[in-house]
Design a protein with these regions (language model features):
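Charge-dense, helix-prone N-terminal extensions
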Residues: 1-111
Length: 111
């Protein structure tokens, strides 16, 4: 998935704003980051539950891994945008949004 497509998907969720976050783009709902995009490294980072993080990392440990240190223990998970299907990235993005967004916003995206 290219960076423009990723950004478009992030901004398609309700009440999302894009702001810089150090050398990355961040996508926020209710002032909380649910995803970041590192354009240079072609990586996205998502805020997942521990269970979802484990499932994704087990699926493809070469392309999906917990962030280092305490961030990874909090569910932040790094995805290689060049090696994964759009469908998988959109699934992770949706889970991340629902993990961070208030219930009134996230309910419509839950399966």
């Amino acid at each position: 998935m290219d960076s423009l497509t990723f950004t478009t998907h992030c901004l398609s969720f309700d009440e999302v704003i894009e702001l810089p976050h150090f050398e990355k783009k961040s996508f926020r709902v209710n002032k909380k980051i649910f995803a970041t995009l590192n354009i240079q490294k072609k990586q996205a980072t998502f805020k997942l539950s521990a269970i979802h993080q484990s499932v994704f990392c087990d699926f493809d440990p070469n392309s999906i891994k917990p962030a280092t240190g305490a961030w990874g223990k909090q569910g932040w998970t790094i995805f290689d945008l060049t090696k994964l299907t759009d469908e998988m990235l959109i699934d992770a993005l949706t889970l991340s949004y629902c993990n961070v967004a208030p219930k009134r916003l996230s309910e419509k995206y839950k399966a």
